[in-house]
Amino acid sequence: MKMKKILKIQKNKIYFENDDEIIDISPEIKRQFALKAGDDITLKYNEICYEAAFIKGAFLLSLKDRTKKGLKNKLDEKFFNKNAVIKAVDKLERLGY
């Protein structure tokens, strides 16, 4: 896996060095993982993406009902980590969202 080092955190977004990826995170995720600029999150990347996808998925479902496929497609637009999206959608389905 390519090294994931945080360039900056602006509002609720993580920007990475040498990468086009931007992850939307909640303040809870920022606190939970003690994220700050300069951190190497390579080892925590999958877990952070999963948590962020789960929270974003729950938020999207609070706005309107979506099919499992529709929710997955929407999250795929926001997150590069496809495994995290699949896990998050499956958990939301198990929880009855």
Question: For each predicted feature, which ranges?
Answer:
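An alpha-helical, amphipathic repeat domain used for nucleic-acid recognition
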Residues: 1-97
